[in-house]
Amino acid sequence: EPDIVAASMRVAPGVTLWGPVAAPEKAELMARPVELLLDVLRRESDVVFVDTSVFWGDAVAAAVAASDRCLVVGDAAVSSATSASRVIELASRVGVPRTRMSAVFNRFGARGADEDVAMRFEIACALSSKIRIADGGQDLAALMAFGRADEAVGQTSAFATSVREATREMLVEL
């Protein structure tokens, strides 16, 4: 368990993150450690969220299946909605009910990420839980580059407000 704590990043009071795998090409070797991590987190945490890429192996499928909430994240990229739809279908096939999935549109308000684009993403996902995270701009990029996620979420910016609201909504849904 000390290794689990050492591999984490505390981003806000009561909110801790793990991942990603340092060497993605070795992700399949992480299946058992991910299962062990999830076992510990289930005992020690109130809620476990799993956020993955669109590339799934056994470790990702097991993590998603064991999670309380699956965040399907997309943005204004051309293939984002299609990729998100595929991930939702895959998650459904490994046993995750759609009620445990949330469509998260990232960088809302950035250039090219307006209301129409966000709505197209949400319609493609066809999930009842929809979240929009406002664009954080260069200020967010600078804070994250120095590992200061807790400070970024604590600000009075549109980004910070949207993250706090999204977290509140997800916790209420659980």
Describe each model-derived feature in a short phrase:
Residues 47, 69, 129-131:
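Well-ordered beta-strand positions
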